């Protein structure tokens, strides 16, 4: 059974749409505790900490009976958008979102998603989760943006969608029409590389 260690609705929808059985439990890991300047490595470290935090607290979580003695996979993900060497998380306000989109208009950036899969077995009687394998990888996709007029950017920012997304855009939402093309994994831009997950769930 798979546990998604994230509160992300886009990751939840990706898993539901491709019919992967899972339950969703937020890890509540404090991301501000990690200091890593390399964006690629930061995404990977945050994904690991989210999954690991949940694995360490699994005994305090009420899990369905089918988890007992069975294989358990905990998936942690973290997405960071890189534009010209700078990390773009969620914009803090509309003004910041507008300024970013002015820069990104007609340009490209990279969406890095760190993936960590902690695989093991959980014994609900002893409350012990025994880890057998940890698989980690950062998957990167190149995202090309359309050349936009100021009124288009303002119109998009006014929807508030950019304020809730890494990089200030949602491929699966309103922002999809402002993205010209993607090089690399498509679902990775929405926060989870489904081909990577399929390959590694199959291995486990």
Swiss-Prot record:
Keywords: Cytoplasm, Hydrolase, Nucleotide metabolism. Its EC number is 3.6.1.9. It is found in: Cytoplasm. InterPro entries: ITPase-like_fam (IPR029001), Maf-like (IPR003697). Disulfide bonds: none annotated. Its main location: cytoplasm. CDD domains: Maf. Its cofactor is a divalent metal cation. The keyword Cytoplasm applies. The keyword Cytoplasm applies. It comes from the Bacteria. Belongs to the Maf family. This is Nucleoside triphosphate pyrophosphatase. It comes from Prochlorococcus marinus (strain MIT 9215).
